[in-house]
Amino acid sequence: MAAQGFLLIASFLLILLVLAKPLGSGLARLIAAVPLPGVAGVERILWRTLGITDHEMNWRQYLLALLTLNLLGLGILFCLLFWQEWLPLNPQRLPGLSWDLALNTAVSFVTNTNWQAYSGESTLSHFSQMAGLTVQNFLSAATGIAVVFALIRAFTRQNVHTLGNAWQDLVRITLWILFPVALIIALFFIQQGVPQNLSAYQPITTLEGAKQLLPMGPVASQEAIKMLGTNGGGFFNANSSHPFENPTALTNLAQMLAIFLIPAALCFAFGEAAGDRRQGRALLWAMSFIFVVCVAVVMWAEVQGNPHLLAAGADSSVNMEGKETRFGVLASSLFAVVTTAASCGAVNAMHDSFTALGGMVPMWLMQIGEVVFGGVGSGLYGMLLFVLLAVFIAGLMIGRTPEYLGKKIDVREMKMTALAILVTPMLVLLGSALAMMTDAGRSAMLNPGPHGFSEVLYAVSSAANNNGSAFAGLSANSPFWNCLLAFCMFVGRFGVIIPVMAIAGSLVSKKVQPASQGTLATHGALFIGLLIGTVLLVGALTFIPALALGPVAEHFSLP
C-alpha cells in the first residue's frame, strides 16, 4: 500500500510538471503584456469594442477596477438567485433562494470560495448554474490571477508607478488561458460520460423497481472551470463523488491535475518574468515538499482504518467510510489534500468521515493560508507574502535590510504583509469562537464533543480561506451561518487582496539593487528550508490550540 501511494504521488507530480511548464511560458507572456502568437489583431478589435484603452493603472486604479467588477458581479448573481423562479431554463420550476442563502452563495462564488449551503440539483436552475455560477467561476479565477500579475510586475519593474491595465489583464486571462483550457477539459469530461445538456430531469425505474429522478444539466462545462479555476462548487450536492461529475478514474486524475495546473504554472511564469527561473522553482519546491508530506500523512492515517469500525467488524482494515469504491482510499486521500492545498474545495470523498488525523491535515492546509500551490493567483501571492516574511526574519538574523529580487523590503511592506497574513487567522479564530458562544451557532452542530467542534472550525477555516469544502455534519443553511460565513469569505478574499495590491504599489516604484556578497540567495536549499519553516511556524503558533481542542482531542479519545 505504501509503494502504491508513493507511486501515485510521484506520477501525479510528474504529469503536473510536464503540463504546467509550457502553460507557465504563456502566462509569463501575459505578465509581460505581450500578446500571445496570432491574437494581437483580435485583441485590438476587442479593446475598441469594449472601450478599453492601453492606459496603465497605478495600484489604486488597478484595485478599484477589480473591486468594481467583483461587486457588480456580486449584485447581479444575488439577483439571479433571488429571482430564479422568474428566469428561463428552469424546467423543474425551482423557487428563488432566500435572501440569506442567495447572499451567501453570491459572496461564495464571487470570492472563489464556492461554499455551498444548498443541494445544487434540488435548488438551482440550469440558468442559475450557467449564467450565474459558471460566469463567476471564470471571473473570480481571473481576478486572482490578475492580482498576482500585478504583484509579479512590482518585482520586475522599477522606478515606475503602474502595474498594467486590469481590464486588459482580465480579458486576456479569461480568453487566452481559462476559456481554451476549460474547453479542452470539458470535452474530455463529456467523452468520459459527464452530462452536458439543458434537459429536464429524467424519471427512471431502478433494478429494484423503485422510481428515481436523474438530474440533468450543463455539468461538464461547469465542472471544467470549477476545477481549473480552483472554484470547487459542485453541480450536484455530492460534488466530485457524484458519478455524473466524476465518473471514472481518468476524470478523477484529470480533475486533480486541473486543480494544480495554473498554480504550478504560475511558479514557472514567476521565474521567467523575474529573469531567474530558479526563483520560481524554489517556490515550487517549497510547495511540493509540504504537499508530499501532507499527502503521506493522510494516506497513512486512512490506511490505518477507524478503530470503531474495526471493532464493529468492518470487512476492511482501511477507512473506506465516506469514500467511493471506484476511487479507493489512496486516490481519495490524494484528492483531499489537493483540493485543500489549493483553495478549490471540490471533494470526491466526505472529509467528515476521514479519521481524526486524516481530517486534520486538510483543515490545517486551509488554515496556513492556502499557500501550498493554493488557488489560481491567490496561492502564489499568498506564498510571496511568506517569502517577504522569511527574508525579513533572515534580515533580522544577519543584521541587513531585507530584500527580495533586488527590492528593499521596508516598514510599509512588512506592515501590509503582517496585515494580509493575520486577516484569515483572526477570521477563523474569532468566527469559530462566536459560533461556539451563540445558540444559533451551536444549534447547527449534529455531533457533540471534539468532532462537533472540528466541524465548526473546519467550516469557518474553509470560508475565511476561500476553500469551500466542509465537514458535512454541520447544518449551515441558517441566517446565522449564511451571514457569518459570507462575511468571512468576503473579508478573507478582499482583506488579503487590498494589502497585496498596496505592497505591489510600493515595490514597483523602487529601484532594483544589484546583488552583493551579503545578499541572501533566495533560490537555494537554505532559503527553501527557511520559507517552509516560516509557513509551518505561523501555522503552528496560530492554530495548534484550536486543533488540540478538535481533531487532536478526537484522535486521543479513540480506543
Swiss-Prot record:
**Any idea which UniProt keywords this protein has?**
Cell inner membrane, Cell membrane, Ion transport, Membrane, Potassium, Potassium transport, Transmembrane, Transmembrane helix, Transport
Q: What is its main location?
A: membrane
The cellular component terms of Gene Ontology attached to this UniProt record, alphabetical and capped at eight, are:
plasma membrane
The UniProt transmembrane annotation reads 5-25, 27-47, 63-83, 132-152, 170-190, 253-273, 283-303, 327-347, 356-376, 379-399, 416-436, 484-504, 524-544
- One GO MF term, please? P-type potassium transmembrane transporter activity
Q: Which residues form a coiled coil?
A: none
Q: Which PANTHER family match?
A: POTASSIUM-TRANSPORTING ATPASE A CHAIN, POTASSIUM-TRANSPORTING ATPASE POTASSIUM-BINDING SUBUNIT
Subunit description: The system is composed of three essential subunits: KdpA, KdpB and KdpC.
By sequence similarity, the record places it as follows: Belongs to the KdpA family.
The record describes the protein's role as:
Part of the high-affinity ATP-driven potassium transport (or Kdp) system, which catalyzes the hydrolysis of ATP coupled with the electrogenic transport of potassium into the cytoplasm. This subunit binds the periplasmic potassium ions and delivers the ions to the membrane domain of KdpB through an intramembrane tunnel.
Q: What is this protein called?
A: Potassium-transporting ATPase potassium-binding subunit
Its encoding gene is what?
A: kdpA
